Amino acid sequence: MIENSSIWVVSDVDGTLMDHSYDLTPAKETIKILQKISIPVILCTSKTASEVKVIRNELNLTDPYIVENGAAIYGESLKKVNGKIILGKKYETLEEILNAISKEIDYKLIPLNNLTDQEATELTGLKGNSLTLMRDRHWSMPFLNPPSFLEERIKICCKKFKVDIFKGNRMSHLLSINSNKGKAINALKKYSNIQNIQIIGLGDSPNDLPLLLNSDIK
């Protein structure tokens, strides 16, 4: 649908499209209306591709989707690039960088995937298969929010290792400097080759700021 519309709705998921109890019901009617008038709804989230596939099925969405805070774009319609556009660093590389930052600041930054299932459930509210899907990361690394007094030192380290950190509602996210939600939107616009696309951006947390800054209506 993106090839046929110059208006795109690009929406965060947690706390925006769904409430903090993970309920999508309030958004379903609006999405149906947008689909009837051929306006694409592009999910743009910190969630994994595995998580978003479930949400897309529930909402009957077929448009491309942006995952892991803008580190990757997937979609069946992205045929010229075999269904994906990758902007981020591999998870294994980010893990090495997070460990290096931990040594530099003398404080252990703990990746989400290092938590036990019980600890991760307490943090996110997810369990069972939902928790498994959340752990299936390839291009970003969420980790527990560090103490605020370390934030400036961490920023200095980020410049050294050419990464960015975005603070979300529940945790922080380590990403390549080449990937965020705004850069992902621009990459998708470039791929579409449509002139003068108007972006309606929806988000609710600091990691949505690149999305909102690259939106025309927010």
Residue ranges of model-derived segments:
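Asp-based phosphoryl-transfer active-site loop
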Residues: 2-21, 185, 212
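Residue-level detector of anion-binding/catalytic polar loops
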Residues: 40, 164, 217-218
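Active-site phosphate-binding/coordination module
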Residues: 23-113
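Receiver (REC) domain switch/active-site residues of two-component response regulators
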Residues: 63, 216-217
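Glycine-rich beta-strand-to-loop/alpha-helix junction loops that act as flexible
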Residues: 69, 202-204, 217
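Residue-level marker for buried hydrophobic side chains located in beta-strands
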Residues: 9-11, 65-66, 201
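A short, Lys/Arg-enriched amphipathic alpha-helix followed by its capping loop at the start of a domain
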Residues: 3-10, 26-41, 191-197
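Conserved acidic, metal-coordinating active-site core of Asp-based
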Residues: 101-200, 206-207, 214
